[in-house]
UniProtKB/Swiss-Prot annotation:
Main location: cytoplasm
Modified residues (Phosphoserine): 16, 481
Modified residues (N6-acetyllysine): 8, 301, 312, 325, 344, 446
Protein's UniProt name: Stress-induced-phosphoprotein 1
Keyword Repeat: yes
Domain notes: The TPR 1 repeat interacts with the C-terminal of HSC70. The TPR 4, 5 and 6 repeats (also called TPR2A domain) and TPR 7, 8 and 9 repeats (also called TPR2B domain) interact with HSP90.
Species of origin: Bos taurus
Length: 543
């Protein structure tokens, strides 16, 4: 086991120094000695990814997940490899699977957000550039009539030449119709799972269903039941709940197969604040509805009302359960929004209930012990648990940042340092650990800035002074060739993602041909951020 740890540490140092082949050899030798060690496969996956051998990185990521299915890092490795292989949908699914095991893993959360953004970009690539554009518009009756309007043609040409204007034109119903034709989808139904309600699409052609019976076709008992229901509705609107209940009760007796009269009674008890009786009636209504093959939308309403009753009582777990039952019957934006609201409240309640500074201290001490032994993955787990128990303790983020740095996860180390500094701006370790991570990434300019901030707080801080001096010397002795700059930059996953984005490649080519285009692109904050990143790593320069 000692030999395995030595090989692993040797591999980590080689990978940090950019000696990828040496790192791969060390990890492979360690795996031969300990083939069930998931951390070794995870590290080798990272090395293969840096080398550009994404298929092998993916295979090692899969092996990591197989050996340790509850470890978020394994899913992160596997998903990252899938990203590089341009298998975005699979990458998204892998991030989602990882979050089932580690719901608060920041790397998985960020990865999932990036994948959703990438998939959204793919989904809405400029369709106005297709070669047979007008032929397609002519062949569809929805757009054929629009082509007679010169302003419509002008609009199409504008979007063809400047697709960035599409976002400002989506309010125009002609554009939504055009997109439906060009993309071959009904955009009215695409947002079914969005939180916010959207205007419903045009009704589809009616199916051959039995027509709703008119009152004159109904049996006498059903007619009387409807009249009682109307009287009940009038009383309900006037807040005369006792009278409303009497009429709904008569309607139910006249037509016992109709669940609506029972759900109306439940609505009255809901307004009266008798939530137990409301739920009992809703359950009874669902039973009657099932027996008589009632419309699933009515069943969904009954479940939603049960959910609302629990929400009123602040029993959010029960509310979520019944909201989901309602959504399984029939999905509506209002119920979805209410369910998400309950989930958000419950999550916050659970987070606050979990806070315990004494247990946080215990976990911190366990983390310190593991860190001293060199078991950084286990130390990180203890620090993460400590943070959940006491999220306002800046030192915990600093300790976890030290773990991330040891595990070569410099971006995550930087995030924890930022959180540490935000919580306690005068805590020196937050600055020195952030600077150390930047130094390890060979970003000497930024590292010097952070070391200087530490010295501003404490001019006698030897760690900051030594670090600053190291960065000055490293910067002075640096004679990187363009190839070295590119190799180091491409080892950064964020840079890899930017450079593999077809849209960004197009923008960079356009900037080379037409430098004036830069100012236009910089108006988009997302693109500006990506360009700034490429400038920071030295891949591009603007004069």
């Amino acid at each position: 086991m000692e030999q395995v740890n030595e090989l692993k540490e040797k591999g980590n140092k080689a990978l940090s120094a950019g000696n990828i082949d040496d790192a791969l050899q060390c990890y492979s030798e360690a795996i031969k000695l300990d083939p069930q060690n998931h951390v070794l496969y995870s590290n080798r996956s990272a090395a293969y990814a840096k080398k550009g051998d994404y298929q092998k990185a993916y295979e090692d990521g899969c092996k990591t997940v197989d050996l340790k299915p509850d470890w978020g890092k394994g899913y992160s490795r596997k998903a990252a490899a899938l990203e590089f292989l341009n298998r975005f949908e699979e990458a998204k699914q892998t991030y989602e699977e990882g979050l089932k095991h580690e719901a608060n893993n920041p790397q998985l959360k960020e990865g999932l957000q990036n994948m959703e953004a990438r998939l959204a970009e793919r989904k809405f690539m400029n369709p106005f550039n297709m070669p047979n554009l007008y032929q397609k518009l002519e062949s569809d009756p929805r757009t054929k009539t629009l082509l007679a309007d010169p302003t419509y043609r002008e609009l199409i040409e504008q979007l063809r030449n400047k697709p960035s204007d599409l976002g400002t034109k989506l309010q125009d119903p002609r554009i939504m119709t055009t997109l439906s034709v060009l993309l071959g989808v009904d955009l009215g139904s695409m947002d079914e799972e969005e939180e916010v309600a959207t205007p419903p699409p045009p009704p589809p052609p009616k199916k051959e269903t039995k027509p709703e019976p008119m009152e004159e076709d109904l049996p006498e008992n059903k007619k009387q039941a409807l009249r009682e229901k109307e009287l009940g509705n009038e009383a309900y609107k006037k807040k005369d709940f006792d009278t409303a209940l009497k009429h709904y009760d008569k309607a139910k007796d006249l037509d016992p197969t109709n669940m609506t009269y029972i759900t109306n009674q439940a609505a009255v008890y809901f307004e009266k604040g008798d939530y137990g009786q409301c739920r009992e009636l809703c359950e009874k209504a669902i039973e009657v509805g099932r027996e008589n093959r009632e419309d699933y939308r009515q069943i969904a309403k009954a479940y939603a009302r049960i959910g609302n009753s629990y929400f009123k009582e602040e029993k959010y777990k029960d509310a979520i359960h019944f909201y989901n039952k309602s959504l399984a019957e029939h999905r509506t934006p209002d119920v979805l929004k209410k369910c998400q609201q309950a989930e958000k409240i419950l999550k916050e309640q659970e987070r606050l209930a979990y806070i315990n500074p004494d247990l946080a201290l215990e976990e911190k001490n366990k983390g310190n012990e593991c860190f001293q032994k060199g078991d950084y993955p286990q130390a990180m787990k203890h620090y993460t648990e400590a943070i959940k128990r006491n999220p306002k303790d800046a030192k915990l983020y600093s300790n976890r940042a030290a773990c991330y740095t040891k595990l070569l996860e410099f971006q995550l180390a930087l995030k924890d340092c930022e959180e540490c500094i935000q919580l306690e701006p005068t805590f020196i370790k937050g600055y020195t650990r952030k600077a150390a991570a930047l130094e390890a990434m060979k970003d000497y300019t930024k590292a010097m800035d952070v070391y200087q901030k530490a010295l501003d707080l404490d001019s006698n801080c030897k760690e900051a002074a030594d670090g600053y001096q190291r960065c000055v010397m490293a910067q002075y002795n640096r004679h990187d060739s363009p190839e070295d700059v590119k190799r180091r930059a491409m080892a950064d996953p964020e840079v890899q993602q930017i450079m593999s984005d077809p849209a960004m490649r197009l923008i960079l080519e356009q900037m080379q041909k037409d430098p004036q285009a830069l100012s236009e692109h910089l108006k988009n904050p997302v693109i500006a951020q990506k360009i700034q990143k490429l400038m920071d790593v030295g891949l591009i320069a603007i004069r």
